């Protein structure tokens, strides 16, 4: 019983307080791993775009700091997040790279049920999450695409203490991004991409606790077919890098995932559709589950 109640507190510490603005009990920081996949480091050419993320996450497993399922916990997590992102890549160049600006505000539904012998927590909400805005630089070379970004998550969504499934996190998070896509062959039919993000979390306004910082790596290997279809394997690694304050646990949360992705381009309406499935494994001090993602991108 004592271990089970401690596990519930651990779940909240890593999966809710440090939950993302696109909360689905998946992320260690604001950023949700698995948002990007194939050619995730490649930004588009100058123009206006709307990119609509749809994420479904479910989990029935809570792992210990050793990466093992904690016995006695009956966990049921489900989240759907819809996040329209407006992207403007300008014609302005800085250090040879195109300057870009983008922003998103997610809509989130989350249901959480945790049962242990002698204790139970159940909650579900739908609401608006935290605002994110950033500036980017992007380069398109003969065999490489490069990108840099600096942005910030603002606590515009509702949050509370004690913790709940409310969509807001209640803290600011600067986030820095760097990525590269390598086109292996001259025809650019094979690609390998890596996208890194680092989050510096600040004090949570309701609990006065500062979550630990987080590093996320998303990667993808893909083959282009008929110039309009990409098939590939994608994955991510997310690692909490510092303890929370005050008196944060020494057990830093982490998780990895892998799965397939397909991207389809529709040239006439200038629209792109991508679908990916990611299976999580090696989770420590957090929930471990499955992610389905449908992303629609439209150029104007």
Describe the role of every protein-language-model region.
Residues 56-60, 88, 105-111, 139, ...:
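Transmembrane beta-strands of outer-membrane beta-barrel pores
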Residues 147-151, 158-243:
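Detector for outer-membrane/organellar transmembrane beta-barrel domains
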Residues 40, 52, 84-88, 133-139, ...:
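Residues on the lipid-exposed face of transmembrane beta-strands in outer-membrane beta-barrel proteins
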Residues 69, 204-300:
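Outer membrane beta-barrel transmembrane domains
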Residues 76-84, 122-131, 168-174, 209-215, ...:
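Residues that define the transmembrane beta-barrel architecture of outer-membrane proteins
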């Amino acid at each position: 019983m004592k271990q089970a109640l401690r596990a519930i507190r651990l779940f909240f510490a890593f999966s809710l307080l440090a939950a993302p603005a696109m909360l689905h009990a998946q992320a260690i920081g604001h950023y949700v791993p698995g948002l990007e996949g194939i050619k995730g480091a490649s930004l588009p050419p100058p123009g206006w775009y709307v990119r609509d993320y749809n994420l479904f996450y479910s989990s029935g497993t809570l792992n210990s700091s050793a990466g093992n399922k904690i016995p006695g916990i009956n966990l049921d997590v489900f989240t759907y997040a819809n996040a329209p992102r407006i992207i403007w890549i300008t014609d302005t160049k800085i250090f040879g790279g195109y300057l870009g600006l983008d922003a998103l505000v997610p809509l989130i539904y989350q249901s959480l049920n945790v049962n242990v012998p002698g204790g139970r927590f159940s909650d579900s909400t739908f609401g608006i999450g935290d605002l994110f805005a950033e500036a980017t630089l992007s380069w398109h070379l003969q065999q490489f695409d490069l990108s840099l970004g600096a942005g910030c998550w603002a606590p515009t969504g509702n949050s509370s203490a004690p913790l709940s499934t409310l969509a807001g996190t209640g803290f600011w998070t600067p986030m820095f991004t760097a990525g590269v896509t390598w086109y292996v062959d001259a025809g650019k039919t094979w690609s390998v991409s890596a996208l890194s993000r680092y989050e510096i979390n600040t004090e949570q306004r309701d609990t006065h606790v500062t979550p630990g910082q987080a590093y996320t790596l998303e990667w993808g290997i893909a083959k282009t077919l008929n110039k309009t279809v990409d098939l590939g394997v994608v994955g991510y690694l997310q690692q909490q890098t510092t303890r929370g304050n005050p008196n944060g646990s020494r057990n830093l949360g982490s998780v990895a995932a892998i799965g397939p992705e397909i991207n389809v381009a529709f040239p006439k309406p200038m629209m792109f559709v991508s679908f990916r499935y990611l299976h999580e494994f090696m989770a420590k001090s957090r929930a471990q589950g499955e992610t389905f993602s449908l992303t629609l991108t439209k150029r104007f």
